[in-house]
Structures are given as structure tokens and as C-alpha cells.
Amino acid sequence: MYYFSGFVLFIFLCSISAQQLVGQTRTLHISTIHIQQHSKKPLASVRIATYNNGAMTDAAGHADIFISNTEQAISFSKAGYIGGTITIPASSNDTSLTFTMQPMEFQGKAVQVTGDRNSVYGIASQDVNIIKTETLDKHRGQTLGETLKRVTGLHTLQTGPSISKPVLRGMHSQRLLISNAGIAQEGQQWGSEHAPEIDAFSIGTIEILKGAAGVEYGPGAMGGMIRIIPPDIADTAHLHSSITLQSQSNNWQGAISPSLSWGTRFISNDAFGLRAQITAKQAGNARTTDYVLGNTGFTELNGQLQGKYSFSSGESIQFTTSSFDTELGIFKGSHISNASDLLRAIELGHPLQEYDFTYDIDFPKQQIKHRLLSIQGTIPIQGLGLLEATYGWQFNDRSEFDAHNLRVPKDSTFLLEQLLVKPAMRLLLETYSGDIKLKSIQVDELISATIGISSQFQQNKRLGKVVLIPDYFMTSLGAYVIANMMFDDIIISGGARFDNRSISIDRFSTPTRLINDSVLNYGGASFSGGFMWQVLDHMRLAMNIGNTWRPPQVNELYSYDIHHGTAQFEIGKRDLSPEKSTTLDIALLYDTHNISFDFSLFHNQFDGFILLQPDRARPTITVRGSFPTFRYDQVQSVMYGAEFQGDYTVDDWLTFSLQGSMIRGDNLTTGNPLFMIPSDRISNALHAHRESFLDVFGDAFIEFRMTLVRMQNRFDPNLDYTNPPPGYSLYDINLGGTILHGPLKGISANLSFQNITNLAYRDYLSRYRYFAMDTGFNCIVRMTIPIL
């Protein structure tokens, strides 16, 4: 691990020292313009790079770069925008050049046939959605899963109001990779109630890659990838500071998140910047329409520090380090001491006792600490392309606490408290990762390529009485190649990857359970290919087919104990084989200045699909109480569906949006529907926006949204503990703007009203739907105050 990081640093330093200017040079003046609808504005902080030089545009969108009097390929890129490459012939006498850049809009596809998509995403024909900073600002303070719910095809697996896990086209956890600051987020993500340990206040941009992404990102991206990009660090001399405040009425949550950004430029035109942010949150018990959900409060304390040094010659090195700490209560109504009360609670559908509002967090509960360090370096290499190296380290400390212990007499309160104060299960996960890729390799005039290698070393240690998974050490290695062939109106893409994973399991023995020392080895290949065709000026057709695999995870093989967060007893299966998937995605995109839509079809065929499903006939009775039993199994299955998203804008200020998704999942082994497949849903919104409203508010908006969720009528009645809940309709209002004048000038605020009818409902993907309803009406106030 340490040798690998040293090797990456050695390659980085040697490549910098090898850069030489060739021949005579001249100065090229570059301007960058931001195009959105009918406006053209200068665009700052655009990275301009040749094979041996580079620059960053200033606030006016200008930059000067030295180029040799030979043929030059100049690339331009900026997070959230479609980049590209242009070739300057040796015979050119041009002294100025203008780049026009289009933003990757929220829900819009970041696809343009004339752009160099390989330098951004790898497989150019894949389906990509972008959530920009401006949209994220309107949802700060919610969980990552809640923030993502408005993306078509994305749902959330909810475990109470504080735990929300993204589900993309029916897949989550081991099949959906979440990348944070350039490295895969590793934090016991196999648990359905283990939400990503990411501070939503510190996110700059979110990119959602739909469909099989295993070629570039490995087996964990079988169902797609969610890429979390921290805020930009400006390469200009600056000092900025702001404070974001947020409050919610349902659980009386309060949050504060101050940030500070500083940057400078040196005489050499090198640039250095730092950004720091701290977030604190506290929330009490959440409320449904009729009652309080006992012990659902939580606290968070998070921090993030970023730094970036950009060389005038085009190289850069940056780091991100973050700390995430949370303590959250687990709904008391889900932990029940005996089998009869468990069945009665499921039959009643509401808690067996009433609770009052409080900020106190009692047992059962979870405490999670997550530390992350990411170091990334980029180097343009003459005649090859752009070399990127990433080193990552993460440490995850998860403690889960019991609420019951039947071995202790009911009148021995002191003894019970002494036992419960220690975690029933504590998991310590440390992960090292290293990735090197060479991208934008210009094979010839039409073909560009990316090659890369990746590695990961992971160790898991267990403490406590509960032994859900054993101790293990895991090594993963992978190598891949991706190529894009670009014609005038079509891009053809393809790629291949091979991975090997080795898992060493430590011996474990109890009177009822034995795990011997063992080494598990898995290997497999992934392939992907497709095209993006510019059918008309405003219409594009994309198709992608991928074949991916993933090895079984340790929890799927060895689980045999209580999983406290989900309040269920989970049993693994040791003879599971690798899971394989063949995915077909087709998307039609249409985009003009006032009408845009995106229609997608997808089909996933699984060989050896690994699933966790209830064994309703045999609830498990333990000394900690009675719990529903869930078992891992492997079947043949298929998932398929359709998604639609469209916008119609009237007079550039009023927009009507419509989006919907439908997914079907079938267990081909039994002939029954798959368990926990998201329900069909349709959402439509009316959004009004003004650059200036009454000369008081700038960027003012108001939005009314209605979401319709259909009852899931495709289920196996002999499998689950209760039938799916009825469908429901939710109505939300969101409004806000920025104050233009006076002592409060520059303050941005928005107000959200969720579930304004205070509807009593249950979502099929809620882990607590057996015991309680979802939350009722909620009012959210957000305010960002600029300090410097």
C-alpha cells in the first residue's frame, strides 16, 4: 500500500521534470464564453491545456498560453460544463481563440458529439445526469438520498427520517458505486440502512451515470455510479466566506455550515487555493401525521478541507480530506422484545406505545465515524495525453447498540444499562486505494482512448457480541481500456476491463457457529460498447450495451446475526457464485431553447442475482428480542423499465416539467416478482423564475410540485410479512431568491413546504413500513449569508 503511493508520487514528480518546450513559441490569447439559452457570458476558471503547457481563465474569461509553432491540440474543461479539444495547425498565424461552452444541465444529458466526452466520462454513449450547485443549494440540509430523489430513475431506501440510501433503477448498495472526491466511498455500504457518510452541505456537483459502469469503475458499478464532486477551488486571488443556516419543522432540525475559501496567484502564474467547511446538525424525533416516531433524532458534526496547486505549465495536484461523525437513533417501535409483540406490531401497523418529542437519543442507536483523504495529480504528457493519479485512504468506524437483552432480569435496570452502553457490534473498516489513468490519448484523428489500472486494499475488524460478518482482508486489482471514435455526427464507444479480487477470512468459532480460515478468489471481465448519434440538430439517439460482473460480498456469504439498523436477523449463504449482468440502455434526447425531453429504456438480465428476502414463517428469537428473518439466496432474474423527463418553457420564465419512471423485476427461478422493487411514479412541476422580482429579489423562483406514487401490485404474497402499502400523492412548494439591495444584500434564502396536505402514507421502500407511517408535513428554511 505504502509502496504504491510512493510509486504514484515518483511517477508524478518524474513526469513534471521531463516536460520540455519544443521549438519556438508564441502567445495565444484565449477567451471562454458560457452559453445558456440565449445568453453569452465570460466563463472563469476554465482549464486550458496543451501537451506541455496550461492556464486557467480569469474572471473575464481570458487566459494567455504559450504554444510552439508546431501543430497543437488544445483542450478546455471545467466541472459542470461540456469540454472539448481543438487542433491548431502548424501553419496557423492566429493569435486569439474563443471557446464556447455549454453547461451540463440538471436532468440534461452531458452529451455533445463535437465534444471530447472521453476526457470526462470514458464511455461517451452512456447516460449521464448532472445536478449543479445551484440546484443543490435549494436542498441543502437533507440527506444525500433525499437530494437525489428528483432525478428520474432514482429512488431512496428509507430507514427512518435520518437514513436514506440511493436506489438507481432498482439497484443499490453493492451494485451502485458512490464516488467521493475521486475515490469509491467505502463504509459498510452493503447494509441497506447504511447511508453514505457524506455531508450534503459540502457537495459541489453530483453526476449520475446510469447503466453498467463496471468497465471504468469496477464491479461495484454494475448498476451505475453516483459521483460526488466537492466545490471548485478558484485559481484566482480571492478570499470568500459564507454561512449557511437551515431549519426543519417536522423534527425541529437545526444546521449551520460556515465555509471559507482562499486563493492566490504567483508571479510564475502558478495558482494555489484552499477551502474549508464545517457542518453541525441536530434533530429530534420525527412526526408522522398521527404520532411521534420515538428515538429517531440524530446529530452530525462534519468537516472538510480542500487544497489545490495548479502549475502554469498545466500540471495540478489537489487533496480533499473530510471527517463525518454522526449519532442517530433507531426507531424504538422496530426493536421488539418477543415474537407475539412483533407479529402484533406488524398487524397493527403502528407503534405499540406512544412517544413524546425529544432531542435525546436512546438505545437502540448507531454511532458512525468516517475519515477520508484523497490526493489527485494530473500531468499533460507530450504526444500521449493527460495522466491522472489518485491515492485514497478511508477509515470507517461503525457501532450499533442494542435495546434489549433477555438474559437480564427486567428489574435489573442497572445491569442492563451497563450491558447496553457497549456496542453490540462494532466494525472497523480501513481502505487504501490507488488509481492511475492516461486519458485523451489521440490514437489518430478519429479515435481517442483511455487506459487505466486500479487497486484497493481493505481490512475489516469486528468487535462486540454480535457477529454479523467475520474479520477479513480484501485485495482488488483491475485494468481497463476505453476508446471513443468520433465522426461528424456520431460517437462510437467501447471498453473492456478485467478484475481480480482475493478475500482472506479469519477463523471464528462459537458454540453455534464455525468459520474456518479461508481464502476466496474471484476474477472476471466486463465489456461495454455503444454509440451516440446526432440524428437532427436538436435530437440525439444513444444506445449502450454492457456485460458486467461482481463477486459476492462478505455479508452475503457469512451473515448470521441481528442487523440492528434494519431490525432483522440476516443469514448468509456460503456457496454463492459471482453475479453477472447484461445491460441494454437506449435513450432519445431532444433539446431546443424551450422544449426538451429525454426518454430511456433499459433491460438488465442477471445470471446468479444475489438477493435478501424475508422468511416470514420463521422469525428469529434471540436474547436481544424477536426479529424478522431474512435470508440471502441466488436466482436468475431480470429488471427492465422506462424513464421520461421533459420540460416546456414559456417566455423564458415559466417552465412545466414532467418526469416518470417505471421498473419491473422478475425472479425467473420462481416465476414471481422480485422483492423491494420501486413503485411506478410520476412527478410534475410548474416552475416560475425571474432574474429580478420587484427589484427586491434576484434569481427569484417559485415551484409547485405534485408526485404520484402507484401501489406496488407486483409482489409475492407468500414472501413478505405484509402486503405493499397503498399508493399516494404528495404536494410540495418551494420558493426563494437573493436580496438585491440594503443591509441584507447578497443573502440567499429559500423556503420549502413538503407534504403540504399532511398526508398519512407509507412508502414501499421504507424499512419501517411494517411498524409506522412516513413523516408528515415539513417546512424547511434555508439561508446563505455571504461574509466576505
Spans of model-derived segments:
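Short, acidic, small-residue-rich periplasmic hinge/interaction motif at the N-terminus
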Residues: 35-41, 47, 77-81, 94-137, ...
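Short acidic/polar hinge/loop motifs at secondary-structure boundaries
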Residues: 63-66, 183-210
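N-terminal periplasmic accessory domains that precede
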Residues: 96-100, 144-147, 162-167, 179, ...
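Outer-membrane beta-barrel translocator/receptor signature
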Residues: 187, 202-204, 215-290, 296-303, ...
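Periplasmic-side early beta-strands and strand-to-turn transitions of outer-membrane beta-barrels
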Residues: 263-362
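Outer membrane beta-barrel strand-and-loop segments of large Gram-negative receptors
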Residues: 415-437, 571-577, 583, 592, ...
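C-terminal beta-signal and adjacent terminal beta-strands/loops
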Residues: 549-550, 605-608, 612, 708-715, ...
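Gram-negative outer-membrane beta-barrel transporters
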Residues: 602-605, 623-712
